[in-house]
Amino acid sequence: MKLEVKKLNLKYPSGEKALSDVSLETDGVIAVVGAEKSGKTSLLRCIAGLESFSGEVLLSGEKLQNIPAECRDIQLFFENFSVFENKTVFSNLAYPLKIRGEKFSEIKPKVDSVALDFGLYDVLEFKAKRLTEDQKRTVALARLFLRDAKFTLLDDPAAGFSKKASGEAFSRVKKAALKKSGVVVYATENIGEAFEIANEAVFLNFGQVKQTGSMEDMYYRPSFVVVAEAFGDYNKVEATLCADSGKLFVTLFGKKITLAKTPEDLLSEDYIGKKVIVGFRYSGVKIVSSSQTENGGNTYRFSEFLTKRGKYVGKVETELGDIFVETDEKFGGEFTLSVESAGINLFDVSSEGSLTIS
């Protein structure tokens, strides 16, 4: 089984483009990542055959439009889910199997198994109207995994749960999705969920694909600033890109930093001598007590501290703008800043696209 999307375009009734030349390919689990209104839901609706679009959607090599709706074997979960309020949880779960003509003796073990996986076994005989909203949403999700459809489309399935229940809901969906033998497309705003559930991803921004590939590549080798920032904890400043003796360097915070990339790694050597965006993560910035450094550099003090994941994040006001640094303790003295060269990304000032060859 394989899903291919080729140069898919979709316009809103107003004429505004919802999706522009979107392409992806997978035979397993793929994440579609992007902020609200990035085009995730529109893409899933196109794959499901619910929108008119230009381009191609191929299901196991066959064009979507050539496959009768009842033969596409696509199941999908959108936020506007529904359950039968006056039917039991068991009946709600069993419904898709029952309409396919399966016998009770075949249905019951499947329902029992999914109910156990999703924490619904003890409420199987309850009518849905007795359930909490979180439980109703869980029923709708669990129902999706009762049969092993070839193509499963999940639109931010954990997003509608309460804060308390969302983590557990994601864990259950992840476990069920990874057990499936078919294709799973998992759309989410949550970069952490995407990292956990899929090895490959498509990053959408305002209907355009900004990067495809592994989540690891997106983290360490982002194609655009918006991709880098989606993971959080990202600094960016402008500096002049220089070259000397076959090496690239920038001057940050009063220190010359030789980069891991060379001029040959640039998309164009025209960038040398010009302002570029220099990006790096909070964790890639180190502070060195001004009394210990021998390498020069400008001196700073933290202006304020935040706490995040058990660590302090210190704010530093510099000549290049505000910088944030992860630190284990609140440091009160003067220091210089050092940025790890291997973690530096370079971007074009206007397009905010990467300057280096992937």
Locations of the language-model features?
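Non-catalytic connector elements of ABC transporters
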Residues: 41, 245-358
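ABC ATPase NBD coupling module
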Residues: 63-76, 99, 218
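Conserved ABC ATPase signature
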Residues: 127-131, 135
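Conserved ABC ATPase "signature" region
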Residues: 105-123, 174-175
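Internal alpha/beta loop-helix hairpins
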Residues: 188-255
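Short helical segment in ABC ATPase nucleotide-binding domains corresponding to the A-loop/adjacent helical element
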Residues: 90-98, 108
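Conserved ABC transporter NBD signature motif
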Residues: 55-63
